[in-house]
């Protein structure tokens, strides 16, 4: 990153929706990931809607708190194709997902995520699949309870 870019970023408000979108979702925007979580101030929601309208990136509201929102941003075709891969489809079916089209999966995940936020259910680890993580690593994370991984970056790697 150039010093000019760094200086520009430093002058921006951390509450700025455009900055948060760029910082948190750069791999998605660049087409390197199928999806990404975006957590930002509620006040930035309209800016995100405006920025994403007409783009190839869609969003799904996962949670809205008093001051924050959590969105799943995704490229619809890429995420649909990823979820349709046999290993991912089988994983989701084992976790109770029946209808395998993207919108039904997102709605079912929302229900499970809300139950977790309300402390009624454990964390829905299938989020890893929705974020495009390899199913082997999601299964490894569940099996090893987040420990004994080979390496960690954006996610914890359990299988080489």
Enumerate the predicted regions with their spans.
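Short, extreme N-terminal leader segments that mark the start of a protein/domain
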Residues: 1-39
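Short, flexible, solvent-exposed loop/turn segments with mixed acidic/basic and small polar residues
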Residues: 22-31, 59-63, 114-118
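Conserved catalytic core of nucleotide polymerization and phosphodiester-bond processing enzymes
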Residues: 33, 63, 106, 142
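Short, surface-exposed beta-edge/turn micro-motifs
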Residues: 33-35, 67-69, 124-126
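A glycine-rich, hydrophobic loop/mini-helix early in the fold
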Residues: 45-105
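Internal catalytic-core helix/loop-beta-alpha segment
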Residues: 96-125
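Hydrophobic/aromatic-rich, well-ordered segments within soluble, folded domains that form packed cores
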Residues: 123-150
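Accessory, usually C-terminal, subdomains that scaffold auxiliary metal cofactors
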Residues: 151-160
């Amino acid at each position: 990153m150039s010093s000019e870019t760094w200086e520009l970023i430093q002058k921006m408000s951390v509450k700025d929706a455009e900055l948060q979108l760029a910082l948190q979702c750069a791999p998605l925007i660049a087409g390197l990931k199928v999806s990404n979580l975006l957590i930002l101030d509620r006040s930035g929601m309209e800016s995100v809607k405006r920025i994403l309208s007409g783009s190839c990136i869609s969003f799904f509201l996962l949670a809205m708190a008093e001051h924050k929102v959590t969105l799943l941003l995704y490229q619809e075709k890429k995420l649909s194709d990823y979820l349709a891969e046999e290993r991912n489809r089988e994983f989701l079916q084992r976790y109770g997902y029946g209808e395998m089209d993207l919108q039904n999966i997102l709605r079912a995940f929302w229900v499970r995520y809300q139950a977790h936020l309300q402390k009624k259910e454990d964390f829905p680890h299938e989020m890893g699949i929705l974020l495009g993580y390899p199913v082997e690593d999601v299964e490894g994370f569940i099996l090893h309870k987040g420990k004994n991984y080979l390496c960690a970056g954006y996610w914890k790697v359990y299988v080489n």
